[in-house]
């Protein structure tokens, strides 16, 4: 027995030692740290050209391409999406007939026996610009099929397409999420924002794949098609380069390039997306979000939402809430009412972890987009806090920042940890200036989000100023580097967050911390707070 105990101690001691070397939120709040800027890292923010073989069409006829997976509301169902046929772009375009080809997924637990079949629906969307000299776009046929009745934590093989046309994909596979319980979680959840399709993006995805995620969260700003004119001319700053255009144009083929580049990953690992400002894509008749809402499948119906712009889902013992910053969010809005109902239904004995995501951050100390989402914060922060939100992921700011636990700008041991992860690699390059740097505090009236409007960013700092004169207390760590993060739930109270930088080796850590829930110290406040 003594020998067995000694052997067990020797086996566990490296893990214990390693765990002790990683800080936890129990050690906080932390003194704010700024990692000095490495000026050599701003290059490579250049989009892949349409001649790159990774973005070119590699199928013929109506064979499926741009295959992707997304979760439904729980472990027993999943969405499979793909595109068939070729997009059209020109002054006059004629949409393909979505009823001309079937939407079928054949699947099973054995690669050589795909004995089950599911059918879904198909659609096309158009991006129309009724102005002289501008080109219109209509997509290939987009298919969405929901597979149901799946077993948890199980590998399934599948192929998609139309078997009657002999237009089927090769066989792919995915693993379903574990059942919702306090003891079962996805192995690794990759988190990335503001991805785009640059050479930096390729580095981000290469590093991300090395970490073998079971699920991917993309926190807005996907293809950056709206940095292009309809003829394919591009710029890092659309408004600077094209101030005279009659409407903010887009080049929709960039979405197809993005889907092709990502297929090797998204055909195996579910991708959950929330919209960013680059997905708005205004067109004729004031239509918005057409590409975003058409190309991805969302569990909005399953989660009681009426919009692709906000929804929720479970992944094991985690309840994820994906919120829309570019649709009404005030306390009289449909989204706010939906959020109240969604949070009220969460059973923390089944899904102990509550993780929220939306695009523009509430807690960021960079000059870029500083306090831009203050009105959303005023509307929703108390509600999310009262239901004990554990972690919040945001993008929009092209850098990395992790907060101390915070609520209403005050350090609070029961507040969420806010993580800005808008460093995926897009062509607008990194954010490098901080609002507390001398001369870098923006003019207050320039900060409100131009889409939702309104000004809510009143003075709030200890010296009653718009900006801090030092790195804010809520900011634990900030660094301007491209990268991605990995979230690993260890149990119902401990989660490991790791941030990886593109310039490092795939296994080198840029930031790492255990995020620890304290349900005994931080009981839920929703019965004490009036949200009427």
Curated annotation (Swiss-Prot):
Catalyzed chemical reaction(s): 1D-myo-inositol hexakisphosphate + H2O = 1D-myo-inositol 1,2,3,5,6-pentakisphosphate + phosphate; a phosphate monoester + H2O = an alcohol + phosphate
Active-site residues (renumbered): 369
Coiled-coil annotated residue ranges, if any: none
Listed cofactors: Fe cation; Zn(2+)
The keyword Metal-binding appears for this protein: yes
Localization per record: Secreted
Keywords: Glycoprotein, Hydrolase, Iron, Metal-binding, Secreted, Signal, Zinc
One GO location term (cellular component): extracellular region
One GO-annotated biological process of the protein: seed germination
A Gene Ontology molecular function term of the record: metal ion binding
SUPFAM superfamilies reported in the protein's UniProt record: Metallo-dependent phosphatases, Purple acid phosphatase, N-terminal domain
Self-association and partners: Homodimer.
Similarity annotation: Belongs to the metallophosphoesterase superfamily. Purple acid phosphatase family.
Name listed for the protein in its UniProt record: Purple acid phosphatase 15
Species: Arabidopsis thaliana (Mouse-ear cress)
